[in-house]
Amino acid sequence: MDEHAHDVVYPLLSMITSPADLRQLDAGQCAELAAECRRFVVDAVSRTGGHLGSNLGAVELTIAMHRVFDSPRDVLLFDTGHQAYIHKLLTGRREGFAQLRQEGGLSGYPNRAESPHDWIENSHASTALSYAHGVAKAFERLGEPHRRVVALVGDGALTGGMAYEALNNLGHDEARVCIVLNDNGRSYAPTVSKLSESLTQLRLSPSYGMIRAKVVRALEDIPGVGQLAGQSLRSLTSALRELVEPHVFFEALGIRYLGPIDGHDVAVLEDALAKAARYPGPIVLHALTRKGKGYGPAEADEVQCLHDLKAQPALATPSRVSDRGAVLVGPRSTDASYTEAFSKAVLDVGARDERVVAITAAMPGPTGLLPFEARYPERFIDVGIAESHAMTSAAGMAMAGLRPVVAIYSTFLSRCFDQQNLDVGLHGAPVVICADRAGVTGDDGPSHHGLLDMVLGLSIPNLAVFAPAEPSEVGGMLVSALELRTPALIRYPKTPGPARLAAPGTGLHCRILREGGDEIVLLGIGKLAKTALEAAELLAREGIEASVIDPRVIRPLDPALLGRASGAQLVVTAEDGLLHGGAGAYIAAEIDAASAAASVRGPLVVRLGVPTRYVPHGKPDVILARLGLDATGMASSVRGALARLQGSAAEPAMRAAGAGAGRGAGGLKNGQRGRVAR
């Protein structure tokens, strides 16, 4: 769509280049701008993919915040930053949406490099209130109390414990922070009612229960109106809880409470925000919204409200986008999915063993646990955005005789490492951790790449680590992990997997994917096993033969793999995780130890992986290629290593005989050995 077409379809939005432009609009124009923002976001996300439902629900909230507060002088923070698309639209980044979440384009989250209006690069939940506390304390200390700090919190963030730690300090320190609570009915109310200590104790007390039950029975005994009266009492009780409990909870923490108000009425929101802006301490404005507001398909999606939409450019035209909706979720990929393989596998083990329980942290759909929840609701636990609690709870279940399987995104494992290490690992609790979205994930950028799971997992002494090379391997690995009776980690990527590469692996054994002699061994870890095969084929065309092994289990390593690798002249490991401290480093150390034990000079070990830096968003294949982790890059690394080995072997010969010892096209000469260089 060209610039002129943008102006025709979005006449008001095309006039907004900064938040200052918003303050020139009247109430009617604000309503029309909200409608235009929704149409624009649906159109843009349909073209590129992205988070839809959360942004559609926060349109009026974001408009009102920018009309009342003066960003970037005032600080606007977005918890779970995928609800910041409207914020980006209103701060001069409309044209960037043509490349939303594309390599070199607009990030799907706040990004400090994009705009001074983005203070934090926030994409993990429950952190904004802590940022807000710190910024507000800094303004107070630096003599700038006139600068306001606003945190938009919602979309599940208040199920995370860190948010409550921040609330406690905000109230105690009387920090001047305005909390805008985006309550879309999918996260907030159940959490607060359970954490409102005084009323929870009251409702659970025997006297309260007996009195309430007697009143209900007495009303229901009244002829003609009894049943209706009893139902009315229950409804009234529920309504009163919703009205009273948030006020009691926040006020008890020393935080002023306003609301609830309509989160889709800009005028009402502006009035409330103006009052909140004048308050000298912490204040929460409770706004009721609807996730996916104004777009039929999102509102009709009861499970996720079109939370995350894949690109469907054929449907993204202005004539087909309306507030009632025209863009639907496109056809599912026919490629094999690791997540779907796990989903089936956990159902299978659950059917065979009633002790199996499945745990997730607010991700039942994306991790593939919805079928398990539907079949075994009594054995399914969603703890909300509380990964630390999930891990320690799983340890407790394992200690008491259950077989917990924790399905979690790889990137979120860093949020609960202490619990993995001390509560699961130290106790040897047989918890199986299934890390989805491992490796380079793509569009969501540095906060969502799963690059640390191997590093973290391998630092826990007794944790078994599995890396399936293809989806068909996931089921067998889950069975093997449950049979170990020790902690275990299975990590697998978001991207579709290859067709079967070889005969299925068994137990803790490796798989030989290609026989190419004993001199060169390529170890492709997880999804990079296929890449190693492709690299070997490229090398074979040049007369360089290499064997390819899929380790399958990184720890404990198969003794057969160690024996084969220790006897080679060159070993190359490739992984789509962090290079330093990852699987390659662990394997290299094990090869070194095995070589020393056998009193042989070990092979040259070349490790390939992701360097220690924050990897931006982009297509996974493109990112991996730039890191040298595609077949071409891996083959190039093999050639370079062979040249090094040839040089190291030739130098002594040249000194002794004045002649060089070369390498033929087929590989290294027998007897040539390289130094162990890792």
Model-derived features: where do they sit?
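Thiamine diphosphate
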Residues: 99-131, 141-146, 172-304, 330, ...
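N-terminal amphipathic, basic-rich helices that act as targeting or association modules
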Residues: 2-91, 249-271, 279, 283-289
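Cofactor-binding active-site loop characterized by glycine-rich and histidine/acidic residues
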Residues: 51-173, 355-356, 369-370
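Amphipathic, well-packed alpha-helical segments that form the structural scaffold of globular domains
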Residues: 34-42, 133, 347, 370-373
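Short alpha-helical segments and helix-capping/turn motifs at coil-helix boundaries
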Residues: 44-47, 58-67, 131-137, 161-173, ...
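Helix-enriched interaction subdomains in cytosolic or periplasmic regions
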Residues: 307-319, 453, 458-501
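Glycine-rich, histidine-containing beta strand-loop boundary motifs that form or position
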Residues: 56, 78-80, 153-154, 181-183, ...
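Extended, hydrophobic alpha-helical segments in both membrane/secreted and soluble proteins
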Residues: 149, 153-166, 368, 380, ...
